[in-house]
């Protein structure tokens, strides 16, 4: 049997077909690899171009001449501003075309060109990082329902702090000035700081918390500067509440003393008095101070106009102790039949913090015996333990608040 010429050619073609298919697949892999390399190189090129642009901008900034920093005294007209530059003096300068005259306000920091003294940039206010850290970013989750036995104090602080912030028009209608500040005083553990947290939660204001000891600084003038910057920050974030805990550390009565440390503390208090007189109550800045030694505070700090209301926090009575017990035992796993009133009767003279400590100690007794519930006996043993600590306290402090 003989094959024709056409059949022979088709047989040869069928033999080369797998070879060409393999070759095409190899070339496709090479093309895909080259394309991937090209995309990678393009990404690297874009990244390098971005770095080049950034370095060019940085080089341009480095080549720019330095600017004078001044403070605006007042705008003169649409194109002129009176600026104070230390130590040269005051100058009337022109505005750069990029600066809006409406953004230029008195006491703001500005940058002036080195040669022409043209105002070309508005700078942010200078605030110490230690002062900026005093601002509480997260609003405390304490509420008035978590404060037991202080109904009268809650009503008074609402009138002084919460009402002016939320409804200032009521004071305008009556024609009376808004209160500036309030002093919370009483023995330790009676709920002063807890109530301040609740006020911050309900007013939805910027809450700035500072301890009096933080304002006592090593170098002369540092404490006064921190007080000034504290109120500057409060104005910028108004409405705001400044809570000063342990105010007796800087607000004690002034005495004749040759000590440099005492003089610096007195200067800090004088700056605080100046700020309390200087800022207007209508700016929605309220001051809450707390202390457990009102007897040593300076009379100048306590006068009306600076501290408009003084709220006493006495030790809780039996009903108040019962309310505090109910609040702190609300989430505890208690056995049935626990008589909380009897437990409150066993703690005469106890503070709110000690009542909370009784609940914690009762839970610890239950844990010690591997139980998941708290009994009446646990509470009674906790009362005995906590009140025993109370009886060993310094008698002079107890005598002070008798």
UniProtKB/Swiss-Prot annotation:
CDD domains the record matches: RecA-like_PAN_like
The UniProt record lists the keyword Nucleotide-binding: yes
PROSITE patterns hit by this protein: AAA (PS00674)
Keywords of the record: ATP-binding, Cytoplasm, Nucleotide-binding, Nucleus, Proteasome
UniProt: ATP binding residues: 186-193
Ranges in coiled-coil conformation: none
Matches recorded under Pfam families: AAA (PF00004), AAA_lid_3 (PF17862), Prot_ATP_ID_OB_C (PF16450)
Gene3D superfamilies in alphabetical order: 1.10.8.60, Nucleic acid-binding proteins (2.40.50.140), P-loop containing nucleotide triphosphate hydrolases (3.40.50.300)
Record has Nucleus as a keyword: yes
SUPFAM superfamilies documented for this protein: P-loop containing nucleoside triphosphate hydrolases (SSF52540)
Protein's cellular compartments: Cytoplasm; Nucleus
GO terms of molecular function: ATP binding; ATP hydrolysis activity
Superkingdom of source: Eukaryota
A cellular-component GO term for this protein: proteasome complex
Family listed: Belongs to the AAA ATPase family.
Its biological purpose: The 26S proteasome is involved in the ATP-dependent degradation of ubiquitinated proteins. The regulatory (or ATPase) complex confers ATP dependency and substrate specificity to the 26S complex.
Protein name: 26S proteasome regulatory subunit 8
Record organism: Manduca sexta (Tobacco hawkmoth)
